[in-house]
């Protein structure tokens, strides 16, 4: 590209960023993405890396969608737990009336401090969300789920009565109100969404999300989460293999993906990710079924190494920081590392 065109392009890019905000346009190959964005870990090291900035951005709208039992709520609860570790306040708008406090506690959520609302209709849910955001005192608000945000008119109407586009209009209006307040108060709002099938689609993907198109436009990050397999110990099923694709990302280059394990009753297995990424970045040596770290054998087979890292928290933390340094992410100094019971 000649010099004049380069100058014109640079001026246009600067004008776009000035008018629409940092991250509204970028080169796909850029690695030096916005470093001043405040983020919260997703609870998955691989997903934090794939997001490019080390986690989910604050002051933005996030959409997490996928099929049933794919790990949508687990991922949001992990994000809540990470926010609480940093001293933040979290709210859960349970429109599905399906939150399991015991499971949330097992994942690491401080349920005593978690704000929860079970609204009667979609308008009430979104009004509560807006009031919490405007207060400036809540750091993350989760809405579970968009599909359950039933408009008041539909609840009060007759069963079977056609209600065309009510939910889409409700979402569009609410997001217009929410966006400016979210940015001003630096609150993260996570919408969980479900998948539906479009009728009559022959070519292309028939899947779509509920609630119209507004959320697709307003979301800074959209995550597509899927269950890809099962984790077994002998004959017993102990968890799911999960893949998250970053469908949209306005704070870093999109279209990356992360694979991790979700263990029943535990949530995302950070130890499994440390093993996989440690081997990938040559921090952990793998010879046959044996794994070694700093020349010392730490276990035979992934399950045994996972147990070793659970017992030796400081070693797991040390490897994690080395992985973060290798990929250019900030160290998680705020993460509390309990004293290791196995040392």
From Swiss-Prot:
Domain of life assignment: Bacteria
Pfam families, sorted: RecA, RecA_C
InterPro entries linked: AAA+_ATPase, DNA_recomb/repair_RecA, DNA_recomb/repair_RecA_CS, P-loop_NTPase, RecA-like_C, RecA-like_N, RecA_ATP-bd, RecA_C_sf
Annotated ATP binding sites: 66-73
GO aspect biological process, one term: SOS response
GO CC, any one term: cytosol
Keywords on record: ATP-binding, Cytoplasm, DNA damage, DNA recombination, DNA repair, DNA-binding, Nucleotide-binding, SOS response
Subcellular compartments: Cytoplasm
Gene Ontology MF term list: ATP binding; ATP hydrolysis activity; ATP-dependent DNA damage sensor activity; damaged DNA binding; single-stranded DNA binding
PANTHER family hit by this protein: MITOCHONDRIAL DNA REPAIR PROTEIN RECA HOMOLOG-RELATED, RECA
Function, as annotated: Can catalyze the hydrolysis of ATP in the presence of single-stranded DNA, the ATP-dependent uptake of single-stranded DNA by duplex DNA, and the ATP-dependent hybridization of homologous single-stranded DNAs. It interacts with LexA causing its activation and leading to its autocatalytic cleavage.
Family listed: Belongs to the RecA family.
Full protein name: Protein RecA
Organism: Nitrosomonas europaea (strain ATCC 19718 / CIP 103999 / KCTC 2705 / NBRC 14298)
């Amino acid at each position: 590209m000649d010099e004049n065109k380069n100058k014109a392009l640079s001026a246009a890019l600067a004008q776009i960023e000035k008018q629409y905000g940092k991250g509204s346009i970028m080169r796909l190959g850029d690695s030096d993405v916005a470093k001043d964005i405040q983020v919260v870990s997703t609870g998955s090291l691989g997903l934090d890396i794939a997001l490019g900035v080390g986690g989910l951005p604050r002051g933005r709208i996030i959409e997490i969608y996928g099929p049933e039992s794919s790990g949508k709520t687990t991922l949001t609860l992990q994000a809540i737990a990470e926010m609480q570790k940093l001293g933040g306040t979290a709210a859960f708008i349970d429109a599905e009336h399906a939150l399991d406090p015991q499971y949330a506690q097992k994942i690491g959520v401080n349920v005593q401090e978690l704000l929860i609302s079970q609204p009667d209709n979609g308008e009430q849910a979104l009004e509560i969300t807006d009031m919490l955001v405007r207060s400036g005192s809540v750091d993350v608000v989760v809405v579970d789920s968009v599909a359950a945000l039933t408009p008041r008119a539909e609840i009060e109407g007759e069963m079977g009565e056609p209600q065309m586009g009510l939910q889409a209009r409700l979402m569009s209006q609410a997001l217009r109100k929410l966006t400016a307040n979210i940015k001003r108060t630096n609150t993260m709002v996570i919408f969980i969404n479900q998948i539906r099938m479009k009728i009559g689609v022959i070519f292309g993907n028939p899947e779509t999300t509920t609630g119209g198109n507004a959320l697709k436009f307003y979301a800074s990050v959209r995550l597509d989460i899927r269950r890809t397999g099962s984790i077994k110990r002998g004959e017993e099923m102990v968890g799911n293999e999960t893949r998250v694709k970053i469908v949209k990302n306005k704070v870093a280059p999109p279209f990356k993906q992360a694979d991790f394990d979700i263990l029943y009753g535990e949530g995302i297995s950070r130890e499994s990710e440390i093993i996989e990424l440690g081997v990938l970045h040559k921090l952990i040596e793998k010879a046959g079924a044996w794994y070694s770290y700093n020349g010392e054998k730490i276990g035979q087979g992934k399950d045994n190494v996972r147990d070793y890292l659970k017992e030796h928290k400081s070693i797991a933390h040390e490897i994690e920081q080395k992985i973060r340094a290798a990929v250019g992410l900030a160290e998680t100094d705020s993460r509390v590392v309990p004293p290791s019971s196995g040392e």
